[in-house]
Design a protein with these regions (language model features):
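Substrate-recognition/specificity elements adjacent to catalytic centers across diverse enzyme folds
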Residues: 14
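Cell-wall glycan-active module
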Residues: 2-3, 17-365
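Bacterial N-terminal signal peptides that target proteins for export
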Residues: 1-11
Length: 365
């Protein structure tokens, strides 16, 4: 909301007021004793010489930090590079082993769930696509998510069977060097510094787009974390998942109810109370909050404002009173990673620690 500033307001107070407002909306400013660095130069220095397009990475990240007003620090740069290394080994469009089999399995799964004979789907895939090859031939040679996304876009728009199986929803959900969510990118285009000629989905698969939206997801939100580890977990599990998991742990201590520490404070998309909300309701009398108060304040769990609610403060006060010690305000969520691309037993905590190790090594270079 626009606001007017009195002319007589001292400049120092005005500056502090503006900076405070910016901190609420986006990335945190420089920390005390942190020095700004030249983003492009640091990227060139930190990236392996084997990466052929280091200059393109340097230019894209410099523009990204500038346009998003991200503090240009070595830690922030290394945090972005660490995620990109973990997710793609610095490839803007990384190859996915066995992607053709994964894609065909997903198509067959959709067909079976909709009671469509698989042979009909396979027949539809033999139709010639816009590039002159059949969809089946393109699937046989697909190597990257960018290629697969293009196949599905064509299949959905050109073939009735594609529309029946997928509607208007392309089943490729992430892309680019940081494997950022395409749905996230589509909701956060404000301030994007380059002209988008095609769709946001297509832009995510470019180096500049993948880095810009990935950096936005990683760094462009205010959080009171004392180490980057928790931002890496949030990158995987959603903004504030680490803070919310710590809150769930406090709720569990205060109520005696065992909870999954997944960072989801409400059952999103439903008016029904989820497990965390039900556990908090058991404390309603002690907290002096009604069920509607509890719901309304839990709904702020996707923002920094949640930490200012009576619910957040009172739950931690009660849990600390019962445990006799100060409790952490952030913990790694206990979430099992699920994706057709994942063949091992991996968790959000594993991901966050791996990325943090890469960040630390980057800062040691």
């Amino acid at each position: 909301m626009p606001f007017a500033v009195p002319r007589a307001l001292p400049l120092t107070i005005l500056a502090a007021f503006v900076l405070a407002g910016c901190a609420e909306k986006g990335a945190a400013p420089l920390k005390k004793d942190e020095k700004p660095v030249d983003v492009a130069s640091v990227v060139r220095q930190k990236m392996p010489a084997s990466v052929k397009d280091r200059n393109a990475w340097a230019d894209a990240l410099a523009k990204t930090f500038e346009s998003q007003k991200i503090a240009p620090t070595e830690e922030n740069i290394c945090s972005v590079l660490a995620v990109a290394q973990q997710e793609s080994m610095y490839q803007s469009d990384p190859a996915v082993p066995g992607l053709n089999k994964i894609a065909r399995k997903e198509i067959d799964r959709r067909a079976e769930s909709m009671h469509i004979p698989v042979f009909l789907v396979h027949t539809a895939l033999k139709i010639t696509s816009p590039n002159g090859k059949s969809y089946s031939e393109r699937l046989d040679t697909v190597k990257t998510e960018k290629q697969l996304s293009a196949i599905f876009d064509d299949f959905i728009s050109m073939v009735p069977m594609g529309q029946k199986l997928f509607g208007s929803l392309n089943p490729v959900h992430t892309g680019g060097p940081m494997q950022v969510s395409i749905a996230f990118a589509e909701k956060h285009t404000d301030g994007y510094p380059w002209k988008i000629d095609g769709t946001v989905r297509q832009e995510v698969f470019s180096l500049r787009g993948g880095l810009w939206f990935g950096t936005y997801h990683l760094l462009n939100y205010p959080a009171n974390y004392d180490e980057p580890l928790y931002r890496f977990a949030d990158f995987n599990a959603g903004w504030y998942a680490s803070r919310n998991a710590a809150f769930q742990s406090a709720v569990s201590r205060a109520s005696g109810v065992k909870l999954a520490l997944d960072g989801d404070l409400i059952a999103y998309g439903s008016s029904e109370a989820g497990s965390t909300e039900l556990a908090v309701r058991k404390l309603s009398t002690t907290l002096g909050l009604s069920n509607s108060d509890i719901r309304r304040q839990l709904e702020k769990g996707d923002s920094l404002a949640f930490e200012k609610t009576d619910l957040y403060k009172k739950v931690f006060a009660l849990a600390e009173q019962k445990s006799g010690k100060t409790l952490p305000r952030a913990i790694l969520p206990g979430i099992q990673l699920e994706s057709p691309k994942i063949t091992r037993n991996l968790t959000t905590a594993w991901f966050a620690k791996r990325v943090d190790d890469r960040r630390a090594r980057c800062m040691g270079l």
